[in-house]
Amino acid sequence: MGWIGDFFSGVGSLISSVSSSLGGLASIAGNFLKVVSPYLGIVTNIISVIGNILGVKKDDENLEDIGAKAMKSDKKPENFDSYNDYIKHLRENIKLDKEEMENASKELKLARTAVGATIVSKGIEEKKGMEISVDTWVAMAKAGLDGKIDVVNLILDTFKDKNEQKDFANYVDGKAGFKEEKIVTDKLTDIYKSLEPNASDIDIEKKVMDMDKSK
């Protein structure tokens, strides 16, 4: 595990090194990387697809490119009224060198992806009118929700405040108390019933229970 920790530490250092371009986003992206690193690929895929659905990013835009443009731009997120305006600026005004992108180190590619994911996540928060904790993204990855975007979308709409998101993450980790577990399972049951009205109660219960990865 040592070399993996060193690798992600190096990626984090790359993010910190461009803090002048990213402003406050640098520390947010650094924390994002630290928390999601074991699930980075799954989390970034979930964020990317939700970003597409909500119009935060275009289907042909990838997180690495968005992050690379942010690290290259002389304007920071705080120079704009919203993250969605910032993303529009990156899309329209910052160009990338294709050869440089292809030849970038693995560490730099991951740093750019982490920055891009953080930016799109913030854009999703604006669209949803809520804050989304990094632990919530990780919990959805742990719960096996990659590719189950309808479920992810409704989870975000259902567990909107910090305490609700914490209860959901604790449920996935098998750490929720009895009361919290009951609240979370009831909400997840309602989500699945709305998506699969013809599914049996047993099938829905299994889907909900399968999200508790401690069992």
Predicted segments, located by residue:
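Short, intrinsically disordered N-terminal pre-domain segments
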Residues: 1-14
